[in-house]
Amino acid sequence: MAVTTRLTWLHEKILQNHFGGKRLSLLYKGSVHGFHNGVLLDRCCNQGPTLTVIYSEDHIIGAYAEEGYQERKYASIILFALQETKISEWKLGLYTPETLFCCDVAKYNSPTNFQIDGRNRKVIMDLKTMENLGLAQNCTISIQDYEVFRCEDSLDERKIKGVIELRKSLLSALRTYEPYGSLVQQIRILLLGPIGAGKSSFFNSVRSVFQGHVTHQALVGTNTTGISEKYRTYSIRDGKDGKYLPFILCDSLGLSEKEGGLCMDDISYILNGNIRDRYQFNPMESIKLNHHDYIDSPSLKDRIHCVAFVFDASSIEYFSSQMIVKIKRIRRELVNAGVVHVALLTHVDSMDLITKGDLIEIERCVPVRSKLEEVQRKLGFALSDISVVSNYSSEWELDPVKDVLILSALRRMLWAADDFLEDLPFEQIGNLREEIINCAQGKK
């Protein structure tokens, strides 16, 4: 059976971030391997940067050795005390591991300001050390358990190589993607969501990945009325002079709890393909049938094939009842129209304690998982229909980890669009294929 740490996810993340964003790999656990410091050192020496965590009834304390433990060699030791979500530290100075762990005390003349005595299950430290760590003035702390971790880079060379390979695979899949049945040349994906959720930023991020540098074609902002006031349909080129990719991202005015957001009646017109690019939204009323941007007889290529709801991860818990009712109403309309829809969770990288290393397996990250479950609980989305992304906002350079999240979300949207096309009535598909064949043969 695998040996697991006693640390909670929160405490582990606090320690990781405090000591340089390292990933903790468990080497030794007293309750499993025994409370024998000699055995501990045999197992934990020459492992690189090392973190020792000691659990008592009332405290979590420990020691960090940046150079790691090496037999009879001095290493700089930093002591720490973790109390709830706060961590304090004290630079103890240079120690050999034999001194720190009370091995052969007589020979190495161990000082008494800090000792880890595994055999007697206690930590001894002087009053000054206690005070510097913010602990109660009790010179002896009983050990319930202790663990030693190797501190590894959260993004080592092997992981980075894997991310780069996955990025290449996703780019290839999206470049060569063909909509189901060749019924349309480009999939139309509508981005819907509250004002400021990151809809325009997601388009910019997708475009950045395929352009090879960070771009800002769509204006973004953080004010309460949003930036997108027009209906925009964005085709994206593969590179500066490349061909257009097989999808179009459609941006709209954001949803609002009060006045100023997207008029609900406009949504059905957008879905049906009745609204032309650059139509100026009117929050107070929907488009008029005689408007010059109204399309009378849209074809399948003009319709929306997938809807992606975009939500800011940091705002889900603050959704008002009005916003929840509005989103659920739109979802019902989409179901009635047969339009497949997914959810996109943005701004996850701004959540507390999230590091770049977490983005590789972001959906396993405890706080992100909590947000996914909150979207499921409040809005009814299946967990499998929710993607997590980190948009480009303040960066100057592309990041392969972010690219993988963005491309994976886009691929999921295209799969959803294929489901929509495949589910079209047989008669409609037959007529469309006949039109496609006639066009290919030059017939009218």
From Swiss-Prot:
The keyword Repeat does not apply. Residues 1-152 form the TLDc domain. Induction: During infection of non-A non-B hepatitis virus or hepatitis delta virus. GO terms for cellular component: cytoplasm. It comes from the Eukaryota. It is found in: Cytoplasm. The keyword Transmembrane does not apply. Its main location: cytoplasm. Gene3D superfamilies: P-loop containing nucleotide triphosphate hydrolases (3.40.50.300). Keywords: Cytoplasm. Hepatocytes. GO terms for biological process: cellular response to virus; immune response; response to bacterium. This protein aggregates to form microtubular structures. Belongs to the IFI44 family. This is Interferon-induced protein 44. The gene is IFI44.
